[in-house]
Amino acid sequence: MKQIVAFDFDGTLTTKDTLIAFIRYACGFRAFVMGFLRYLPQLVLMKLGLYPNYKAKQKVFAHFFKGMTIETFNDLCQRFAHDNMHLLRSQGIKTLMQAQDDGAEVVIVSASIDNWVQPFFADVTVLGTQIEVENGVLTGRFLTKNCYGQEKVSRMLARYPHREDYHLTAYGDSRGDKELLAFADESHYKPFRS
């Protein structure tokens, strides 16, 4: 039977949320603080479960990146990954590499934007939130649903539709991974914390 090993990215394979780290890296500390202060009410309501996660995330993303060329954005993503490999949890990366060595298909299922996750893992499939680009420019909107909660399961089924044909092992660390962990044959919650 085919083996698939799915990892969440932020908090599972990394030590912090990469959306925040990426914005700070791409825009600088001052712009980062000013942008987050602008959306503080929505972010607080989101944390309290009173405002949808995807809406808050898209508003923040649009504030910082709407109008940027995809070429510039992808260059930032490449540099961010290169300069921030220290964010990766060593035990998580060892587990990922061992799964590959064992012949499993490895996939990262993340609410983060594909563009900055993929450069961390050249030879791993990434199923993340995708951004809309028109005429080479970011619109500030998401092309897909935010890959969070049930959407992680939907993405897995879209990519691997014949569930009975594979054994799924999943790693996650938050409520956004709950459905994926329940969907898996074998699940690991917060596995790489020391």
Regions found by a protein language model. Give the residues of each.
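A broad detector of the eukaryotic-type serine/threonine protein kinase catalytic domain
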Residues: 24-27, 78, 143
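Cysteine/selenocysteine-centered motifs that mediate thiol-based redox chemistry or coordinate metal-sulfur cofactors
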Residues: 44-56, 60
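C-terminal cap/substrate-recognition subdomain and adjoining C-terminal extension
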Residues: 75, 82-194
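Metal-dependent phosphoesterase signature
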Residues: 56-91
